[in-house]
Amino acid sequence: MSHTPTPAAGSGHASANSQTALVIGAIGVVFGDIGTSPLYTLKEAFSPHYGLTPDHDTVLGILSLVFWALMLVVTLKYVTVIMRADNDGEGGIMALTALAQRTLPGGSRSMYVVGILGIFGASLFFGDGVITPAISVLSAVEGLQVAAPKLEAFVVPITLVVLGMLFLAQRFGTERVGKAFGPITLVWFFALGAIGVYNMARAPEVLHALNPWWGVLFFVEHNWHAVFVLGAVVLAVTGGEALYADMGHFGAKAIRRSWQFVVLPMLTLTYLGQGALVLRDPSAVSNPFYEAVPEWALYPMIVLATAATVIASQALITGAYSVASQAMQLGYIPRMHIRHTSHSTIGQIYVPAVNWCLLLAVAVAVVGFGDSTSLATAYGVSVTGTMLITTVLMVIYARANPRVPAPLLWLFALVFLAVDCAFFYANIIKFLDGAWFPLLLGLILFTLMRTWRRGRKLLHDEIRKDGIKLDTFLPGLMLAPPVRVPGTAVFLTADPMVVPHALMHNLKHNKVLHERNVFLTVETLQGPYAAAGKRLKIEAIGDEFYRVHVRFGFMETPDVPLALMRSCDQGGIYFDPMDTTYFASRETIVASANRGMPIWRDKLFALMHRNAAPATGFFRIPGNRLVELGAQVEI
């Protein structure tokens, strides 16, 4: 089960306050995306693209499908089942991939396939990260068209300004403004509920939509066309995957309470309220969200909606930084500069490269599609693809759990694979209408991640093939020992059994050895955090030479000097930061058509490797203590 952050010790009242704070915080961060779905879900369902007439039976059928999608996909699948699979308290597709791989034989074909699924799921997440800010903010600003139609020409420019300010502000962090996210989003949800009740009171028969029979009748009446309409229905559950992805920040308990007692009831009320309005006035389908708002509250609602969509976008941008950081740690993407924006919260980071790539892609989406209706056709495919992959990974993970009855597991697999496949199919058939955009983004990212992963393996194999075994090198070196100089030399190496290139270059050109020599290997675990007792492994191999393994979880920021400081506490190596020099190899990649990858992928890997952030910043190594020695490697 998930590890909910422990409240401060004290009275039960303090514990209750802590839980309340977590619930409000979860509402602001976790539910921003799904909370802004009412802006466009019903509008998209009745867009000309689907050819539906907003008559009584059709409206109730769509509302029934929306409500039961929320119940099945979010409440049953994510809240009840998926959130039980935590990786030391962490959730998300990368964490679930690691859990699923643990149940499979190491190095097996199935483990490789699961890794591919995880990479593709993470790639789709970034595609979602482009569409969500674009469609959310654009939908909110489109309220100006309802309030003053003459402002229609200003919708896209205003959207670009809002998004530009949002991305430009990332470098300053969100620690201060983030405290307001929960209360603002809470006001947003209660406003949704109030508007829903206001409209339901005028057409209470809309409550019949809670009966799933209306959803069944919709399928009976519309046959295969109903499956096509699922492409709009799924917009109501976009953001549901955030419940699992953000589990490590707030804990499963707070997220479940937020969903059950605030988010689900308010979403149900607002969808029913929009449906009640359409039952009374079918022309309101042009923008049922804003048409449902009383005229006196329209401008305040536009402001509140814009704030809510900015918060939803912020949560997803922050999530993109987190996934990128995890992917770096797990070796799926090159090292990038990471800036910590908070002195008190380690998880608050800013990744400039990710930020500017997201801004560029979001701006292209806003300008290219132009309105939320067009963007909606592109939206669902990345979300449903991620949801489908999550179900597959969950089945693989749960299959190895003896506490899960086999009939229950296969029932889960049958029901949710069918639901996820139906939603995915309904979106993939919109490929030419816009679904190609997030798929193209996902494919580009998938190619980059696979190329980096494969290239790193080829590079490692090439270095190992040409390398000299440490166990045979050291005895020969001691037969004619070079001059020793005071201090400690730390050689960063991926393979602790082979002599690092940096050591060979140092001996060749400087003809000296340091008093103490450490061969340091940094390992990233499949878990989010490394236990204190397993952080460091020190092996003395004679004559002041040491092998040191430093382990970090994929959620941690590697700090090599700090880890070595702790080696003194363990009684291993004497370590003085001011008397230590770090040596690292900086390989220059030479592409070859006769090796493991096509020449274009070799060149792509060489480009990525050349532009990767140096080890100095990534491992927190002081720049004035680092010596990088070049080596040319052909792959």
From Swiss-Prot:
> How does the record say this protein sits in the membrane?
Multi-pass membrane protein
Q: Where found?
A: Cell inner membrane
Source taxon at top rank = Bacteria
Q: Which GO terms describe its molecular function?
A: potassium ion transmembrane transporter activity; symporter activity
- Give the reaction(s) catalysed: K(+)(in) + H(+)(in) = K(+)(out) + H(+)(out)
Cellular compartments per GO CC:
plasma membrane
Its family remark reads: Belongs to the HAK/KUP transporter (TC 2.A.72) family.
Q: Which PANTHER family match?
A: LOW AFFINITY POTASSIUM TRANSPORT SYSTEM PROTEIN KUP, OSMOTIC STRESS POTASSIUM TRANSPORTER
What's the protein here called?
Answer: Probable potassium transport system protein Kup
- Name of the gene this protein is made from: kup
